[in-house]
């Protein structure tokens, strides 16, 4: 599961970029960024984001998800509750700290619309994160997954290696687009099926 957690975001990002490129929704830059430069930035991102995500995943999974599991709630309720609280926690960041131009670079919509779309995204992501936690009973695969999300996507956009066409950003935005979000949901539901089949075998 550790390897899966490490590979989820790079794999989904690669698929989304390739689909976007084939449909004209994504352009790969002609910039002369070397692999060495990208790997250097990637490693710096991994180091810094790893520390931040220890604290974040300690709250969302090690505490919140763990407490909700003790209440014997349905899977759907857990996904939605964790997704909602995780989403609402981002309210100050999106409504105050993010500039209009930064939001527009991700998705060409207004601030409030961007925030509301975020709930759908976090709800879908929470399926994946919740199921990884239930499979492993460990914080660390989640820290790894969350770190890779920040580390892989940010350099691609900041270094302008990948450019998403505004007219198709709703589909191919690497962080909130429909295509990657559906892929992350599929990953989460697949892990859920794996967990349930494993539990049946153990009964």
Located regions from the model:
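Aromatic-anchored segments of alpha-helical transmembrane domains
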Residues: 9-15, 84-93, 147-157
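Interfacial transmembrane-helix boundary/kink motif in multi-pass membrane proteins
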Residues: 1-18, 28-41, 66-81, 171, ...
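Residue-level signature of the transmembrane alpha-helical core
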Residues: 6, 42, 46, 50, ...
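Membrane-interface helix termini and inter-helical loops of multi-pass transporters
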Residues: 21-33, 99-107, 158-168
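C-terminal membrane module of polytopic membrane proteins
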Residues: 135-137, 147-203
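Alpha-helical transmembrane segments in multipass membrane proteins, preferentially the mid-helix core
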Residues: 121-135
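Membrane-interface helix/loop boundary segments of multi-pass membrane proteins
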Residues: 55-88, 101, 134-138
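Membrane-interface interhelical connector segments
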Residues: 64, 94-111
